[in-house]
Amino acid sequence: MLFPLCLSRRGKKRGEVEGRSRGECGEMLSERVRKSLIKGSAIRRAFEEGQRLAALYGADKVYDLSIGNPAAPAPEEIRRAMREIAEEDALSLHSYMEDAGFREVREAISENLNERLRKGEFLLERRDDYAAREEGGKSREEQEKQGRTREKEERRLPFTAENVIMSHGAAGAMNIFFRTVLDPDDEVMVLKPYYPGYTSFIGNCYAKKVEVDCQGEDFQIDFSDLERKITVRTKLLILNSPNNPSGTVYTAETLRTLAEILRKKEREIGHSIYLLSDEPYRELCYTRERLPFIPSFYENTVIAYSFSKSLSIPGERIGYLLIPAEAEESGELLLGARNSTGALGFVNANAFFQKVAAASLQAKAPLAYYRENLDLLYQALLESGFSCRKPEGAFYLFLRVPDGEEERFLERAKAHRLILVGGSAFGMPGFVRISFCGKKETIEGALPVFRRLALEYGIRKEASGTYR
């Protein structure tokens, strides 16, 4: 904290906190913000603690693995585009545009996505397949006779500029969509483990977060818990794959089951349930399997996308909201989302980086950089005796704390100047999140600390020459 706040109101009226005048001790803050300050952001708090320790001991003596701040340099396409676009006509470059963003940028994004779909970069669900399951099961021959649906769909270019709304990252896209569809007391399903920011985004609309349990070492969805918790107030579900913090990539079979449950519940409660696919890590997948394209599995899907992680430009805050035509009331959603962009004060996404992003759509994420860090960290943790699953995507590793006491583990780590984030922030007490997107030297410097911690917890005996 940069300044002390006296935020307790118990037993006091407004303006009567221990003799202080009205306006002190957070009395002028809204109740929602006051509670947010008390709880704070675990990720930001850890990051700021790392900055404080770095100022005391030197950055090379602090091992900050808390935040997803990529150390891989932005691709050359980004730097080249910045130089070229900076020379464009200043008036057109820096002026307002329509709320949804520059049309030529949205056209470039939609055309790029269409091209990737056409090339088969994503795994598509066969619409005739799931229609057959709902109708009681048709043979593959019957499906092929009905027009070879898959071939037609893959040739079709499903997206246009009208489906795209430029935003300040995926977080901005989510806030735009939430304001568009949520009323107070509506319910939003979040799948454990989940990004902590969802709590604030949902709270901005006075809606309610409903946590859904996961199961197994691979953090798969507990479908019985999901089905039990969907009510008439359920408006949408957030899916994050590859997942932050676990690195899990949900399989096609998982998505089919999820889609079937959502359709079943839609019929029961009498209205649509939107699935918001949060995709800042779409390009960061370490398996050879194609990443499922979620709108092809469930028609009421919208996508919040960010260029931050894949192109190493998190501070530029650029992304988009994609609303496919198949989504229920898609026309109204698009109109509402444009309105929400202005009403939230965004007005429009960053003009300069809209154009930079459009010019860099062919740039590739530095997967080799992250994979090298991951392999180094994962192998060392296993050899030290820790229990963790190798992530399939994103750039985080979710480590189980040996005795389940995450706060004590975090404090012990901090005593060695190792900064991590507790699993409670992600809805999963007893874990810690480790970011491996930083510099390799930081990862290497952290490994002896993990070995010391393993010794302290008695999960690994010291071997001569192994630890320092």
Annotated model-derived regions:
Residues E111-E115, E227, L361, R408-V421, ...:
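PLP-dependent enzyme catalytic core of the Aspartate aminotransferase-like
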Residues N163, T180-F201:
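Conserved PLP-anchoring active-site segment centered on the Schiff-base-forming lysine
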Residues T199, G203, V210, Q220-R233, ...:
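Active-site pre-lysine segment of PLP-dependent enzymes
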Residues G345-N350, K364-L367, D375-V401, G422-M428, ...:
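Conserved small-domain helix->loop->beta segment predominantly found in fold-type I
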Residues L29-E134, R140-G169, I176, S360-A363, ...:
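N-terminal small-domain helix-loop-helix segment of the aminotransferase-like
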